[in-house]
């Protein structure tokens, strides 16, 4: 920690993890509640499988998917869309301003399936008589979610958040090393404790 970059690296690590924890919590719970409202059980299984698939992909594979979208010049899918609409291509791997959002999006995308299935199992375990009583009392679907579902999920939210906060100084090495493709221009926003130690 004698390096001048220690503060920036620690800040990056903590802020990315706060972003991952917050976004994963909100989106996973929302996704789990949406899945619990679906009546077609086969469709629920398809959504669960599709959302869980990224969790099993390695960061190397994901980095190649990201590169297919963000490749410089006219090779990347995003640049082709930008040029098709009359814009100039963006050299994504030389522009740090985009990478906070790219890293957050990819990290959340990879982890959301796992978390949402845990929350989905909890939501499905809620006693259905609570909802029946709420319907008899005239509660809307939103009121049922706000007054029954969310309070029943809070204990699990608390446990998972505490466990995630316990890892707040641990960054996912594969995400921060492979996805930005070790671009030196991105170091100010992608350098975290794990990559710095490496």
Where are these regions (language model features)?
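A structural signal for multi-pass alpha-helical bundles of membrane permease subunits
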Residues: 1-198
């Amino acid at each position: 920690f004698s390096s001048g970059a220690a503060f920036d690296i620690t800040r990056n690590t903590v802020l990315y993890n706060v972003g991952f924890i917050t976004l994963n919590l909100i989106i996973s719970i929302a996704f789990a509640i949406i899945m619990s409202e679906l009546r077609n059980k086969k469709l629920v299984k398809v959504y669960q499988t599709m959302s869980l698939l990224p969790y099993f992909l390695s960061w190397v594979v994901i980095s190649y998917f990201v590169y297919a979208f963000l490749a410089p010049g006219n090779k990347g899918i995003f640049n082709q869309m930008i040029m098709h609409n009359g814009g100039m291509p963006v050299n994504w791997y030389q522009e740090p301003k985009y990478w906070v959002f790219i890293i957050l999006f990819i990290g959340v995308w990879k982890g959301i399936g796992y978390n949402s299935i845990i929350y989905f199992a909890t939501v499905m375990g809620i006693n259905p008589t609570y909802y029946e009583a709420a319907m008899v009392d005239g509660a809307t679907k939103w009121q049922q979610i706000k007054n029954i579902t969310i309070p029943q999920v809070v204990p699990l939210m608390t446990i998972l958040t505490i466990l995630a906060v316990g890892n707040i100084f641990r960054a996912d090495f594969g995400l921060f090393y492979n996805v930005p493709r070790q671009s030196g221009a991105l170091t100010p926003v992608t350098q975290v404790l794990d990559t710095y130690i490496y």
